[in-house]
């Protein structure tokens, strides 16, 4: 049972809607407040909030139909209220999730505006996907309670939340945030304060490379997406990237990187220093007993069999699904 009771979500956009849906799916007795702090024309103050409410209701109905919601959608909706402006929506809250647009000045102004009215132990958690904590701490009078909590869309489905902390973050703020996320069924990880954290940095690199391949005329958009869904991305549902490097063999990545760098003359293809160092040491993965992970005492054959089983389970799931597909692009069922 979580000790957090009143949670405020600032911003009625897609991320705010996703977080609200996730919290309403939680069986914990949370009271949620969605707050729109954007100044709007008279008579339009609640327009964005009304739209957000409709989308949250739609999400809950879908989850209910799929058996993923324990309560009736209407019962879940009774735990959320909608507010325009800074006043009521932020009073007595223990956690504030900020989901405003990715504009540093806008987020800084928000922190300056709300801090005086918050309880000293209230946590401010920005859902930014790229902005570092130092940007927030510059304007904060209490930087020890500020963290970033980067959810991934759709936030009510994707388990991961990246929690970024800085040297100024108090242990109680980090611990409370991670504990709360675990209690509502999420998978939090902790990262040091750095622009882009983990997922956005990897995503940006991969997305730009996909667009580069498209612009070069190497493949169609549909075939690029099929390649990701049926190949690269398929494996990532079972293997993390670092584990993938180990299991494939660090020497494979080393030689592939050298070849691509020689062909393209672009620095992003250069082998990383730790890859070069491990090549020198002969730390190539399971077959040498160590790569990035230590495989001492690990039965490599058994480990590979377990991964193969997981791949086959995933493959069969896709093959027998009415909604999953390896096909890239817009599909008939989308129309």
What do the predicted segments below correspond to?
Residues 198-202, 206, 248-252:
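Mid-domain beta-loop-alpha active-site segment that forms a flexible
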